[in-house]
């Protein structure tokens, strides 16, 4: 259930009403909703909004559902401030911690050849970094650098002892990998292109793609245009997927956007290598 509103009382009433409707629907189908396994996460920035957030509550029958500071959803840790510290670097279950554990496990392949080590490292390191990257890619640079350190350690392991003094560019090129920032640009832009091309998922498409009312250069190049109600002043909004997708998609040439998907992917990767610095 998603209820966007600034008034905590309105949010509480709407959420409680939604909960009652779901409870009635489940009871009519001989199912039971468990309030102990229903969680409440209220997103807000800093300042007054953060104070108002504490007033939100949900009445679930005789029980009162209390707010959570963070919750795990589809493998990602969502924090009520919209920040990604806990997911990327904050604890045993963070991405950095998991990557460090996987790097230790890779040492068992020390005697394997380059191809074997590259295949395994791509599967266990690269895939972990890439998962949900369009979502958390707006995280501060110091968090992204922590991921970049782990990626370079994996690349150095794959390339062997002779790569100890190699540059970052040479390491990544030898492995055929993009840096974390380059991957973030690539995956976010690719997802934006799929949304624009297929009009799916419909919710994101209607939010992100508004028709150009005037034939401008942005219109002819197929750039994403938000509606007039969109506001991008807050820090949380500027780091969001939609904001970054619009900004990245505007950077690539219009000629790329009309290519078949396979060609688009190839040229987008080349564009990322040329234009996004390795950080």
Region spans (language model):
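Short, conserved micro-motifs composed of acidic
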Residues: 11, 17, 24, 28-69
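Conserved, non-catalytic sequence blocks in retroelement Pol enzymes and Pol-derived host proteins
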Residues: 6-13, 82-94, 109-119, 137-147, ...
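Amphipathic alpha-helical
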Residues: 202-244
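Charged boundary/loop elements
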Residues: 7, 28, 36, 127-144, ...
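Short beta-strand->loop micro-motif that forms the acidic, two-metal-ion catalytic signature
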Residues: 1-3
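Short, charged alpha-helical motifs in flexible N/C-terminal segments and linkers
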Residues: 23-41, 48, 72, 143-210
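Basic, alpha-helical interaction scaffolds
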Residues: 64-135
């Amino acid at each position: 259930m998603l209820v966007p509103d600034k008034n905590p009382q309105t949010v509480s009433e709407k959420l409680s009403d939604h909960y009652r409707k779901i409870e009635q629907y489940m009871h009519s189908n001989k199912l039971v909703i468990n309030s102990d396994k229903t969680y409440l996460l209220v997103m807000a920035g800093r300042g007054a909004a953060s104070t108002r957030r504490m007033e939100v509550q949900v009445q679930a029958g005789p029980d009162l559902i209390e707010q959570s500071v963070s919750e795990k959803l589809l493998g990602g840790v969502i924090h009520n401030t919209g920040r990604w510290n806990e997911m990327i670097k904050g604890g045993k279950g963070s991405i950095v911690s998991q990557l460090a554990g996987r790097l230790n496990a890779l040492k068992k392949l020390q005697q394997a050849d380059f191809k074997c080590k590259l295949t395994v490292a791509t599967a266990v390191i690269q895939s972990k970094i890439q998962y949900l990257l369009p979502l958390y890619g707006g995280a501060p640079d110091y968090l992204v650098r922590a991921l970049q350190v782990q990626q370079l350690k994996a690349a150095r392991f794959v390339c062997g002892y002779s790569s100890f003094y190699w540059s970052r560019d040479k390491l990544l090129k030898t492995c055929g990998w993009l840096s974390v920032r380059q991957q973030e640009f690539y995956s976010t832009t690719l997802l934006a292109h799929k949304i624009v091309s297929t009009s799916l998922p419909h919710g994101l498409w209607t939010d992100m793609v508004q028709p150009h009312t005037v034939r401008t250069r942005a219109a002819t190049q197929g750039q994403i245009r938000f509606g007039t109600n969109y506001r991008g002043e807050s820090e949380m909004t500027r780091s969001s997927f939609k904001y970054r997708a619009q900004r990245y998609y505007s950077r690539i040439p219009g000629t790329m956007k009309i290519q078949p998907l396979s060609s688009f992917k190839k040229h987008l990767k080349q564009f990322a290598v040329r234009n996004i610095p390795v950080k």
